[in-house]
Amino acid sequence: MSDQPRGALLPKKWNENRSLRDYFDGAVFFAALLIVAFRWEVVGCLVYLGIVGAVLVLSDRISDAFLPLILMTVFVTRCYDSFDVFIRYIPFYAVVLLCVAFHLIYYFKKPTFGTSFPGLVAVTVALTLGGIGSLSAAAYFRPMNLYYVLGLGIMMPILYVVAKPRADAEARDRFTRALFLAGCLAAFAVAIFYARGWNEFRETYHALSFQSSNNLATFLMISLPIGFRYSKKARAWIFIPVLQYLALLFCDSRGGTIFGTLEFFALLVFFCFYRSDRFRRICFIAIALLIVVLAVALLPRVLTFYRYDEKIPHFSELTFRQLLRAAFTSVVDNGEARVGLLKRSFADFKSNPLFGVGLGYTGNEDLYHPVKGAMNWYHMWLPQIWGSLGIVGLLCFGYQLFLRIKLAFTRREFPEVTLSLCYAGLLLMSQVNPGEFCPFPYALIATSIFILIEPPQKVGTTEPEETAPEEPETAE
């Protein structure tokens, strides 16, 4: 096999003319809006997978496949409990996998290795050993358990080996844009849901519940920092993250509301002082003050929106101070499944401290029964680690997190800082949801973020290449 990668099968004009790729991305995003608006998720999934397969065959740039792949994961979140629907298309998925194999072979590049790779290997070891001494062989080798063990484990180092040699500045920028558009699509999906349920909403003014709320909130939290970054180039972008935050509040996701608010205000403070001009500082401060004033002035209505009038006795008779106290004290319901799963995670850890009970453990189905095709999550990142993977899992995931944090603080250029903040949003949401324990898309997104944050490496080594410093992003 030649050391030099082959050129793309597409005409040279595709690689030379960036505007063509921009038109492609625009068409893919507009089509995704139509899919969400008209509920064409199943057909859309097949079409977008077909686009991904075709792109991987025709283009030597893996970044060309980012947008259709990530947008597809946004709109299919609305297909809750649809394992039996999608499993029928296995032959089609096999064709897409052949396209992936073709891309890896035909456009082969020598692997390079950077800071985050050892963490992926460590986590793979923990996932592979998880449940030893507790989980039966039959349970360990169940297809669903293998999907999660391999998908979260060995597939991530493989993704690294494949993607790292292709991780240049353009790939980073296109991935960033794909995450941003995914957040915009998620916000649009929330708006469409409320448009369809407007009559129901007007009856109670309670937040509407829908199954994809946590997933849409996760994509919004991943995307939030990017709108702030784009506002540095054009002032009109300042209000995009505000609209995404409003969509987040309407998701009826408790984790999204709490952690999303924490993230949003942290981003306001950060971008107020990080390479910001006077106009943006004034805007960010005004936005923060406006939200706080509205939240305080409309507290009873806000609590009614989140159904606290149903949770808090004598809601209408309480004073403002009592309402505020009741809102904070009733965030966690001691009777909900997460509280039971948290307690159970300690018991599971004690039963097998070294390796945990494994990802394939089903002993918690009395507290949480997953949909077909999903594992028995604890729905919390840390309990998932110590309950499923024990001490080994804590050490390996802790090592990976240490490497990621170290890398994030080392890479201080604006594009890399933005992606680090995107990961922070995902990590926050993972504390109260499966999050990073979903191989596709969240673990894939997390791994890709740190591949793209790392500096380019010399082929076959862990030594960084010497690259010219990027021009700073300037405000218009």
Where are these regions (language model features)?
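Aromatic-anchored transmembrane helix interface
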Residues: 89-100, 117-132, 140-163
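N-terminal signal-anchor transmembrane segment
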Residues: 3-6, 12-106, 133-137, 426
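Helix-loop-helix junctions and helix-breaking kinks within/between transmembrane helices
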Residues: 34-45, 84-88, 143-146, 211-214, ...
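Long extracytoplasmic/lumenal interhelical loops at the membrane interface
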Residues: 202, 207, 327-389
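Hydrophobic transmembrane alpha-helices and their immediate junctions
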Residues: 234-236, 273, 279, 367, ...
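Alpha-helical transmembrane segments of multi-pass inner-membrane proteins
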Residues: 131, 157-161, 170-200, 210-274
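Transmembrane alpha-helices of multi-pass inner-membrane enzymes
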Residues: 30, 54, 264, 418-476
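A membrane-periplasm/extracellular boundary helix in multi-pass inner-membrane enzymes
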Residues: 194, 246, 250-251, 274-326, ...
